[in-house]
Amino acid sequence: MKLNKMFLVGALLSLGFASCSKEGNGPAPDSSSTADTHMSVSMSLPQHNRAGDNDYNPIGEYGGVDKINDLTVYVVGDGKIDVRKLSTADLQVNQGASTTSIVTAPFQVKSGEKTVYAIVNITPKVEAALNAATNAADLKVAYEAAYAAFSDAGSEIATLVNNQDQMIMSGKPVVQTILANVSAANASVQNKVPIIVKRAAIRASMTITQQPVNGAYEIKALRPGNVEVGIATVSDLKWAVAQYEKKYYLQQKDNALSPAASFVPASTNDYNGANGAMKHYDYSQLANRITVHQLNAPYSVTDVPNVAYKYVSETTHADNDYRKGNTTYILVKGKLKPVAAMWADGEQAAYQEGGDLFLGLVTGKFYANEANANAANPASGGAGNPRVVTYKAAAVYYYAWLNPNTLDPTTWTMSPARRNNIYNVNISKFRNIGLSGNPFVPTDPDPNNPDTPDNPDTPDPEDPDTPNPEEPLPVQKTYMVVDVTVTPWTLHNYDIEF
């Protein structure tokens, strides 16, 4: 089978569409001597995602603001792979409140059964792989393959361009019999090939509806009898997202499993090292934090255009395979300030703003002086390392999953991050003092491994609340209250208490 490049015929220019295509080394494209009919392709983003995509925390749908640059169509049949790459000048793009549709002008083809593939905003890496196919089988393999999501410069699955989402979109190929002797005028009725595509990326965001007091958020512990007691405040909240797949499937699998779905760490050793999580997941954006967006009312679809977000890739597993070390998370960093009652005698007056905080696990009090904290909080039996957690520069950390399957943190079992969704995590309340650092960044015993991700927020090894990556998702101690929202775009939101 030979690779052909097809051109829209000049007569179609009168319809207001033009095509651009690249010359190939194969035979000439279909012409009036071989083509006996006309066809067109219509593409739409789903008004509803497939079953399961919006099971958790859905609150509505958002049409999006998509930047459409081009549409590439592969028509397979009659021993040929015909390729058309159409610019926006060649397309009719309709963006509505909840969906986007793209329609091509009619073009000439040979009638018969065809398999039609279509990709919006094709990236150079994907285009090179698909165009290298010389037969139907090779094209199918290339279309179902996994590609780098963000690491190939110029071939990222999503970028923000002039406040528009420019991202690759794809869907299942469609097999359809193209009728003979259909004119250009009738092609949209008799020979239209409808294809549903999805955005390959995910949008993640974070908001807070707890109201600040003097610029800070109160951390109120819940005592017996549901009595709230203020123990600290947290301010300067910023978030980042990590542990999403380095690769994505161009064509989403029927079960929506992502390329590293089989990676399930059974121990910390499984998580760390060159063949652990760093091989599969992206941690590169942890230092690029965004301010948590303040809301005065529950998050809704109308807030989507105003809330800053980050792109991530699809990251999923079989239902029983979600672990803390293989699930996409949002990390929140804040500035901790204990209330007067939480300080050991004389320590609050000695503390300098922005300095390290030392929490004694024996006394349950904070210290400005490390030596004082160590002396007052000896290890069990009075020997060994003191039981003190250091909060460097008073920084405190909280984490949340993107799309947990329940609203009760003690019953979380999975958190699938699926393409074409917007996941918003909303902080509704702070209940506890958080962690001393980010526990979910893999390390490597080999200091020369260039792929080891940087962890700008290493936790104190004395922090007893630091979770292990092999643990299932449920947490028995709730640190904040969160609600997450996902948006076609399906929008999800849920509230979380930290």
From Swiss-Prot:
Pfam family, one: Fimbrillin_C
Domain of life per record: Bacteria
Lipidation positions, renumbered (N-palmitoyl cysteine): C20
Keyword Signal: yes
Signal peptide positions on this chain: 1-19
GO biological process, one term: cell-cell adhesion
InterPro entries: Mfa1_C (IPR029140), Mfa1_fim (IPR047786)
Keywords of the record: Cell outer membrane, Fimbrium, Lipoprotein, Membrane, Palmitate, Signal, Virulence
Subcellular localization, as worded in the UniProt entry: Fimbrium; Cell outer membrane
Record-annotated disulphide pairs: none
Region (Disordered): 436-476
GO cellular component: cell outer membrane; outer membrane; pilus shaft
Propeptide position ranges: 20-50
Lipidation (S-diacylglycerol cysteine): C20
Positions of the record's site feature: Cleavage: R50, A51
Function, in words: Structural subunit of the minor fimbriae. These filamentous pili are attached to the cell surface; they mediate biofilm formation, adhesion onto host cells and onto other bacteria that are part of the oral microbiome. They play an important role in invasion of periodontal tissues and are recognized as major virulence factors. Mfa1 orthologs from different strains have highly divergent sequences, and this correlates with pathogenicity.
Family to which the UniProt record says this protein belongs: Belongs to the bacteroidetes fimbrillin superfamily. FimA/Mfa1 family.
Full protein name: Minor fimbrium subunit Mfa1
Organism: Porphyromonas gingivalis (Bacteroides gingivalis)
Gene that this polypeptide is encoded by: mfa1
